[in-house]
Regions:
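Jelly-roll (double-stranded beta-helix
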Residues: 1-303
Length: 303
């Protein structure tokens, strides 16, 4: 087994999006290759309705897929295909924008005025950028939860883990998307296919994802099963960790445990032309998309 070392660790940055929604961006709009095939991850977590209720009014997308995962609160959505609905805590929505879609997402929060969820953008390869748009809404009750002997809990949102498959399928990036909880002071190893790019996003508690590489020149603070363990630098809330190559990730959770998203996907390795909500392969395709918007031809006939 080859553990994935950390390639990069950074904190999510505050952003204002939509009509004035305060959120934290883990990555996106900097280097489209850094998490290929994924383009962006937003953490929309807020206890003040004034900072999210303006929402994300009608806007276009082309050339991408989005995966929205709601932890708490509700989101009302509708689109140019005539779909309409409400996502509640634990629900997931996958949208393939393909050739073009207009939609809006309006966070409503919970009874206490709180809202928390994530939206991940995945790129589409050039051969699929103009496919028909489509939606898939998945109820929290349909998302399998694995409870392991060490007390860990893994929700399999997309992809498969230990023979259990998540309900969301058909995404071009062939992702694995897990919501992972590891109890306090626990060593955990999770397999990730070696051909995938992989990242973790911590949103509760803390953990050390780097100890397995046995870094030199740092203070050793603990011992686990006879192994020296470096826990000097725990990664905590709103931390993104990008992993290098290997076939598994390894961590040791902090005194309050840790909860994080673990996401991986097969890199597309194609040119990216990206502006706002539209992602194509060339500048010419991008220019055409915005011309279609201006001319009223953005929404294509289904085929």
């Amino acid at each position: 087994m080859s553990f994935r070392p950390i390639k990069e660790k950074k904190s999510a940055q505050p952003f204002i999006e939509g009509a004035g929604v305060s959120l934290f961006r883990a990555f996106g709009f900097r280097d489209p290759e850094e998490c290929d095939p994924f383009l962006m991850l937003d953490d929309f977590r807020n206890d003040d309705p004034e900072k999210f209720k303006a929402g994300f009014p009608w806007h276009p997308h082309r050339g991408i897929e989005t995966i929205t995962y709601v932890l708490d609160g509700t989101i009302e959505h509708q689109d140019s295909l005539g779909n309409k609905g409400i996502l509640s805590g634990g629900d997931v929505q996958w949208m393939t924008a393909g050739s073009g879609i207009l939609h809006q997402e309006m966070p409503l929060g919970n009874a206490k005025g709180q809202m928390h969820g994530f939206q991940l953008w995945a790129n589409l390869p050039g051969s699929q950028k103009m496919v028909n748009p489509r939606y898939q809404d998945v109820s929290h009750s349909d998302i399998p939860l694995l409870e392991e002997d060490d007390g860990s809990k893994i929700k399999v949102v997309v992809g498969g883990y230990k023979g259990v498959n998540g309900p969301v399928d058909g995404i071009a990036a062939d992702p694995q998307y897990f919501d992972v909880y590891v109890p306090p002071n626990t060593k955990k190893e999770i397999s990730v296919d070696a051909y995938r790019n992989c990242f973790a996003y911590i949103f509760q508690g803390s953990a050390n994802f780097a100890y397995s590489s046995k870094p030199m020149g740092v203070r050793i603070e603990k011992e686990l099963n006879g192994e020296e363990l470096n826990i000097r630098d725990l990664s905590g809330n709103r931390t993104l960790i990008r992993f290098d190559s290997g076939d598994s990730i390894s961590l040791y959770s902090g005194e309050n445990g840790v909860r994080f998203l673990l996401v991986s996907g097969k890199p597309i390795q194609e040119p990216v032309a990206w502006h706002g909500p539209i992602v194509m392969n060339t500048r010419e395709e991008l220019t055409q998309a915005f011309s279609d918007l201006r001319n009223g031809t953005f929404i294509k006939p289904l085929h």
